[in-house]
Amino acid sequence: MYWQLVRILVLFDCLQKILAIEHDSICIADVDDACPEPSHTVMRLRERNDKKAHLIAKQHGLEIRGQPFLDGKSYFVTHISKQRSRRRKREIISRLQEHPDILSIEEQRPRVRRKRDFLYPDIAHELAGSSTNIRHTGLISNTEPRIDFIQHDAPVLPFPDPLYKEQWYLNNGAQGGFDMNVQAAWLLGYAGRNISVSILDDGIQRDHPDLAANYDPLASTDINGHDDDPTPQDDGDNKHGTRCAGEVASIAGNVYCGVGVAFHAKIGGVRMLDGPVSDSVEAASLSLNRHHIDIYSASWGPEDDGRTFDGPGPLAREAFYRGVKAGRGGKGSIFVWASGNGGSRQDSCSADGYTTSVYTLSVSSATIDNRSPWYLEECPSTIATTYSSANMNQPAIITVDVPHGCTRSHTGTSASAPLAAGIIALALEANPNLTWRDMQHIVLRTANPVPLLNNPGWSVNGVGRRINNKFGYGLMDAGALVKLALIWKTVPEQHICTYDYKLEKPNPRPITGNFQMNFSLEVNGCESGTPVLYLEHVQVLATFRFGKRGDLKLTLFSPRGTSSVLLPPRPQDFNSNGIHKWPFLSVQTWGEDPRGKWTLMVESVSTNRNVGGTFHDWSLLLYGTAEPAQPNDPRHSSVVPSSVSAESPFDRITQHIASQEKKKKQRDSRDWQPKKVENKKSLLVSAQPELRV
């Protein structure tokens, strides 16, 4: 009997290990870490019925802990008993999947999400021991580095708030006397009245003296704690959301801290980063009270480590879509996103599915000397830029701090997104009828490239606008934005054309070592459906595998000659799984005529001849309108431009490369002992695409 019991226990232990291995294999993704326990379970009924949902949950030892969406069909559920085994939990979930009233039930695992601020590298070790117990002397944190601020002439609007004069980004304080022209919007009478902004983060201190009068409970909730109070835990680490909120809506004239960009706006916060973050947590945050909240500001995202591809899950993607379709009474929620802080690791925001979403307005950073900070990431989905800082010797962003204080050292792209949200609030007050697409149009049209032109990487797109992979269309200009908002007409309906590239045999195509391949599509503007003649967003969905994913570079060439580096090389990305239909996004061809030849250049910077993989497919998604965005905009010709059917800019680039290779071979042939030249293999592939409208 004793040995039988021992054998049973050993068998049970082995079975548990097998189940654990199977469990880990289910969630192998883009990282090598072990699979964590599910953090949330979402149950979705076929029809809305709260009473039935609670009854089903109770019958299975579960309880309802809120809803991720406003549709009433979806519910967070948790196991009442904390002692249930993993196997028992699986049995319950499996049984519920067969329930006739349940459409789906899904266990969700936590996702890695990082706030996009940082400690200055040269002082991080000094603050490590005290960062969890920050106290304030007067208004300013005594743990912050000493910064000598440049003093400027008194601002036009003499607010008595003690740190206002030090808010250089509002007071012509950047090099050359530049700022974001916010005072011009204020002088027109706009400060964000009747606009509600919600900060999706680690919570906000709603009773802060510089926020309390503007606090909006309808734009706030605590998803981590399952209640309505977004107050963060007082552990020293959860100040990020409060700081972001202060940038938007710090009260003006109360002789405390500084002044928010939209100091009359209503400000709320969602506590969602102070705990496990799953797809459903993100969806619930992005869906909160969408008919009341105008702007959602997020300064977080996946790891900025130079080796991760990650983005919103299916529920969060659904939340984005529902937001732009139904939010703000059908005008669309406005989602503002920080572009990322992985520049020092040569990361690209193209690998971040939040900044590459069509539905987000991605914002970058510039320093007081109008340069790119060391942490800045590059990608063609960035629309515009606001100010931040780069190191401890430069002034950073002034805002409120926890507990009940102020700070001079808010930084990173975390600081840039809330400034953009505040500026957008000014424009929405000027014209509340602006749709989410209207806002993207006027932000890129009024962005000012001039302060940032001394940086490398600027080019001109096919409609004459300056573009940059670091800064988008330039520095946001609040005054210009408000003035354009006042006269802006709602843009025509957006249409989408999809072109699928049909890869000829061999399919998939082998790729090895150091190579270059060019895949071209002829686009006719969707003649068989509603045409897209004036571009907005352009997406490329690509699938490939390669021995070292970070060695690949993807560049898209438009018919008008605009080149967008969709994916630069990322030296730290050693992943060999590749990507599957990843949605790369470019906003750099905005306004162009899409008709003509589009070319996707896929190349490798690998120095290893033996590394290889396969290229499977790619699709081109064109978002835009059949008519000009505004009545007075120039119209494209009804005939495909002759420059498209003739030699395109991409053809000239290809010919130049071939010419240089030919000259190099001729030089080598004249040598007594010719050197071995390893030229890139170039394969130009053209095919008629399959068109889906």
Curated annotation (Swiss-Prot):
Write out the propeptide range(s). 21-116
What residues are glycosylation sites in this protein? N194, N433, N518
Kindly state what the record says about how the cofactor is bound: Binds 3 calcium ions per subunit.
Q: Name one GO cellular component term.
A: Golgi membrane
What is the catalytic activity of this protein?
A: Release of mature proteins from their proproteins by cleavage of -Arg-Xaa-Yaa-Arg-|-Zaa- bonds, where Xaa can be any amino acid and Yaa is Arg or Lys. Releases albumin, complement component C3 and von Willebrand factor from their respective precursors
Q: Which SUPFAM superfamilies match?
A: Galactose-binding domain-like, Protease propeptides/inhibitors, Subtilisin-like
P/Homo B domain span? 490-628
The active site consists of D201, H240, S414
Q: How is it modified after translation?
A: N-glycosylated.
Protein activity control: Inhibited by the propeptide before the second cleavage. Inhibited by ethylenediaminetetraacetic acid (EDTA), ZnSO(4) and chloroketone DEC-RVKR-CMK.
InterPro entries, from UniProt? Galactose-bd-like_sf, Kexin/furin, P_dom, Peptidase_S8/S53_dom, Peptidase_S8/S53_dom_sf, Peptidase_S8_Asp-AS, Peptidase_S8_His-AS, Peptidase_S8_Ser-AS
Residues holding Ca(2+) 2: D222, D227, D229
Q: How does activity depend on pH?
A: Optimum pH is 7.0. Active from pH 7.0 to 8.5.
Which Enzyme Commission numbers does its entry carry? Answer: 3.4.21.75
Pfam families per UniProt: P_proprotein (PF01483), Peptidase_S8 (PF00082), S8_pro-domain (PF16470)
Job of this protein: Serine endoprotease which cleaves substrates at the RX(K/R)R consensus motif.
Q: What name has this protein been given in UniProt?
A: Endoprotease bli
Q: Which gene encodes it?
A: Bli
